[in-house]
């Protein structure tokens, strides 16, 4: 991917230009970990989740998806990230996983995790659609070294 390099644990390092683009598109993106946290220890995993989502979001922006699609995917990713943090609290085995493995375990080809508290079937279907796109992206993109 142009403008990105592979960092530690397979994380992508986002260029300053891409960081600025994300800040314009989703000004509260860097606040997501704070909004997801149950306790202070959740900030680092939350930041890692946001870092894992950034290349996908940049891919959407580069493909010039509609504003409606982008906003829907942002909203869905926000819910998925919060659910990933919640699952880390609910399952000690999940809390031990590195974030990339947690994402790989909970974001599958057929959708994402069931969101709790329970949401409508329509909302869950939208989240599953976003998760399928994220899964395809994560499993078909090749990091530039």
Model-derived features: positions:
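Charge-rich, intrinsically disordered N-terminal extensions
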Residues: 1-145
């Amino acid at each position: 991917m142009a403008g990105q390099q592979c960092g530690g644990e397979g994380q992508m390092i986002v260029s300053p230009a891409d960081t600025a683009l994300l800040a314009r598109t989703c000004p509260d993106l860097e606040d997501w970990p704070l909004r997801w946290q149950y306790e202070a220890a959740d900030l680092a995993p939350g930041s890692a989740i946001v870092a894992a989502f950034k290349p996908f979001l940049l891919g959407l922006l580069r493909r010039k998806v509609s504003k409606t699609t982008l906003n829907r995917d942002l909203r869905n990713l926000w819910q998925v990230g919060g659910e990933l943090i919640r699952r880390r609290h609910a399952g000690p085995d999940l809390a031990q996983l590195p974030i990339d493995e947690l994402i790989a375990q909970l974001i599958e080809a057929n959708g994402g995790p069931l969101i709790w508290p329970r949401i409508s079937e329509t909302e869950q279907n939208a989240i599953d659609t976003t998760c399928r796109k994220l899964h395809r992206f994560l499993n078909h993109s090749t990091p530039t070294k």
